[in-house]
């Protein structure tokens, strides 16, 4: 459904994927790439960096990277310990380490928050987004009621204003 909506608006996106989901849904992962979107690493099991031992966290990133093979990395919950960054750079191959790009966001839709409506999520995005914004949506069970209607409305709103939606890459 998400890919259909993106296609309808000629929008490209970057999907930060959880390795375990890539393993379970290989066809979807391949379709994302085939349709011209970019992918990034979001660990293997969506570990919370500040609550996970450094060696376990690094292993999760490396395990996910074996499947995802992207220099783009977004720490789950946007948090990572300095020791984990240092260890990642040390434990990845020299080429992977040089290319590793940590990606944050400028606007989060809060689509996963069950106390919010799609309208609340939409209003949060348009209140905070502008040129060059990186907007986060979640394609997860928690976000199922908010994500699709919010994404659709955001794409309609900004497309009508002349904005385009681009994927992230190594050069961004």
Task: Describe the role of every protein-language-model region.
Residues 1-70, 164:
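Active-site beta->alpha N-cap acidic-glycine motif
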Residues 4, 27-34, 59, 63-66, ...:
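Alpha-helical scaffolding segments of alpha/beta enzyme cores, especially the outer helices
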Residues 4-13, 21-24, 143-172:
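C-terminal domain-boundary segment and adjacent tail
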Residues 16-25, 47-55, 74-82, 110-116, ...:
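Acidic-and-aromatic substrate-binding clefts and catalytic sites of carbohydrate-active enzymes
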Residues 17-20, 41-43, 75-77, 106, ...:
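A cross-domain feature marking catalytic cores of carbohydrate-active enzymes
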Residues 79, 84-128, 162-172:
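His/Asp/Glu-enriched short active-site or ligand-binding loop at hydrolase and phosphoryl-transfer sites
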């Amino acid at each position: 459904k998400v890919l259909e909506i993106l296609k309808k608006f000629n929008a490209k996106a970057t999907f930060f994927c959880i390795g375990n989901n890539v393993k379970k849904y290989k066809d979807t992962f391949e379709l994302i790439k085939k349709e011209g979107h970019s992918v990034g690493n979001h660990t293997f099991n969506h570990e919370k960096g500040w609550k996970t031992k450094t060696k376990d966290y690094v292993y999760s990133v490396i395990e996910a990277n074996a499947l995802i093979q992207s220099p783009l990395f977004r720490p789950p919950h946007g948090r990572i310990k300095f020791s984990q960054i240092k260890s990642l750079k040390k434990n990845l191959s020299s080429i992977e380490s040089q290319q590793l790009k940590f990606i944050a966001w400028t606007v989060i839709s809060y689509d996963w928050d069950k106390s919010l409506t799609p309208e609340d999520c939409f209003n949060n995005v348009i209140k905070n987004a502008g040129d060059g914004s990186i907007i986060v949506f979640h394609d997860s069970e928690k976000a199922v009621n908010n994500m699709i209607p919010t994404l659709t409305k955001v794409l309609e709103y900004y497309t009508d204003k002349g904005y385009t939606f681009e994927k992230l890459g190594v050069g961004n």
